[in-house]
From Swiss-Prot:
This is Uncharacterized protein MJ0018. Its main location: membrane. InterPro entries: Class3_signal_pept_motif (IPR007166). It is a single-pass membrane protein. Keywords: Membrane, Transmembrane, Transmembrane helix. GO terms for cellular component: membrane.
Length: 524
């Protein structure tokens, strides 16, 4: 059948073409709507995502921050395109009036809701509490004043943190990085942590920490930290003030005087260089599982105690005066070298307990006090210029390498008991000085000179492999109940003599033997 096209009638092909074009147009339009802004008139209205802040009813916002000063925080851009609290800056929580918390950012103050503030952020806070759980970075300065309870937490960075702590209250700081942490009143300039204040600092890196003094019953604790420079100018004072460092490292530490009641403790801490002005009275310094590369104490005065324990290491300990101090090394700990430039106090003790070791002890010049070396179980080299003027070196239960000293005018200036030593070198015993060695094993004993009347040395119940004497001029050496493997005498002159009682000398037993000027050459 043949269809005839009437006038005005659409063909099937044309209808299908129109339908196809319609479908394509719909698809394109949907895509454009999905990707493009909404147009109202001639201007597009951009759709923005809502940020973290809450929209608030202005009439309900009533924030009162107690004694808070709005001032420059530094490095802050106060321009903000947002009307909420998406600032990208540092957040700082403070206690506001009542029981609510106030959150300060570089652009906002928030108290449950959000509100813009003009100008820069607060840096002076006298509020009751600075709360934890803050986030972000504060590149400017923060100042806290007053004796209250503060807590700073989880700020990424503070450029300069300054506060004054005395009376009572506490400050807890958990900030990853602080450029300067200074304890000082910004008005009076006074710098101390005193009274019954508690300062806790943790999880932080501090470039410089400074306080003039820590006193009273103040408690200071650093935990999980790294400090480039830690400095107290006057130091730690009495009344139970205690400073504790745990799990951290300090590059340089400068401490003022540590006096009675001002105790300092370290646990799991690595310290580069430490300088302490003086330790006075009866304070304690405790080192546990820690390391100090170089430690310098100007003077030890009174009876301070230094305790080195739990596998601690001090590479070098140096002081100008030992005084009546008590240095104890135990439990696998080591002091590699102790240097004493002079000693004018009395009864200074160096005690090495089980597993401890002091490798070298140097005393430059004369010592005028008593030094006790007790319980050394490791290799030790002791070098002392002279024991003089009331000074005394007492060695008890020591297993060591060498002891070298001279004795000037002291009754029993040197006493060695119950020890085992490789080499003992006595430079001289003069001016009525004396030395006494008992119950000791010595490989080599060297006596340079016994020159004077009253210069006396006694060996009782000793076992000496080699005994060499350079000169006995007018002094006396007594050997009793002992065994001398080899005796070598260079010279005896004047009234000098050696008295041997019930002892073996060069393999021969002598009930009594006197060696003097006339017969010494037999042992030369």
């Amino acid at each position: 059948m043949i269809f005839k096209k009437r006038k005005g009638q659409l063909t099937l092909e044309f209808i299908l073409l129109i339908l196809g074009m319609t479908v394509v147009g719909i698809v394109i339009t949907m895509g454009l709507v999905e990707k493009s802004p909404i147009f109202i008139g001639d201007k597009p209205l951009e759709v923005k995502k809502e940020t973290m802040g809450l929209f608030i009813n202005e009439s309900k916002f009533n924030l009162t921050v107690e004694n808070t000063t709005i001032s420059n925080l530094g490095n802050n851009n106060t321009e903000s395109n947002n009307s909420n609290n998406e600032t990208g800056g540092g957040y700082l929580y403070i206690r506001v009036s009542g029981s609510s918390k106030g959150l300060i950012t570089k652009d906002l103050i928030v108290s449950g809701d959000a509100k813009d503030v003009s100008g820069d952020i607060s840096k002076t806070i006298n509020s009751k509490c600075v709360e934890e759980n803050a986030i972000g970075e504060v590149y400017g300065d923060i100042y806290l004043e007053g004796s209250a309870n503060y807590k700073l937490g989880n700020l990424l960075c503070i450029n300069k943190f300054q506060t004054y702590l005395t009376g009572s209250g506490s400050l807890k700081v958990y900030v990853p990085y602080i450029q300067e942490f200074i304890i000082r009143d910004k008005n009076s300039g006074e710098s101390q942590i005193g009274g019954s204040v508690s300062l806790t600092v943790g999880n932080t890196n501090i470039n410089r920490f400074y306080v003039e003094k820590i006193t009273g019953g103040a408690k200071v604790k650093f935990k999980d930290f790294a400090i480039n420079t830690f400095e107290t100018n006057s130091g730690n004072f009495g009344g139970g003030a205690e400073t504790v460092f745990e799990n951290g490292r300090i590059s340089t530490m400068k401490l003022g005087d540590i006096v009675s009641g001002g105790n300092v403790k370290f646990k799991n801490v690595n310290i580069g260089n430490m300088i302490i002005n003086n330790m006075i009275g009866s304070p304690t310094f405790e080192l546990s599982n820690s390391t100090i590369n170089n430690m310098k104490i100007n003077k030890l005065i009174g009876s301070p105690k230094i305790l080195v324990e739990d596998s601690s290491i001090i590479n070098s300990l140096e002081t100008d005066q030992l005084g009546g101090s008590d240095i104890e090394v135990k439990d696998g700990s080591i002091i590699k070298e102790i240097t004493i430039h002079g000693s004018t106090g009395t009864n200074g003790k160096i005690f090495v307990g089980y597993g401890g070791k002091v490798e070298k002890l140097f005393v430059e010049g004369n010592i005028n006090s008593r030094i006790d070396l007790k319980g050394f179980s490791g290799l030790i080299d002791v070098s002392i210029g002279n024991i003089a003027g009331g000074g005394k070196l007492y060695v008890d239960n020591v297993i060591g390498n060498s002891i070298s000293t001279g004795i000037i005018g002291n009754n029993k200036g040197l006493e060695i008991e119950d020890s085992s030593l490789s080499v003992v070198n006595i430079e001289g015993v003069s001016n009525s000085g004396s030395a006494f060695i008992k119950n000791t094993l010595i490989y080599q004993l060297k006596i340079n000179s016994l020159p004077d009347w009253g210069s006396d040395m006694t060996l009782n119940k000793v076992n000496i492999t080699k005994l060499s004497i350079n000169e006995i001029r007018n002094g006396k050496l007594t050997i009793k109940n002992s065994e001398i493997g080899e005796l070598h005498i260079t010279k005896i002159s004047g009234k000098g003599k050696i008295i041997v009682k019930k002892s073996y000398v060069n393999g021969k037993y002598y009930k009594k033997l006197v060696i003097k000027k006339s017969n010494y050459k037999k042992w030369s």
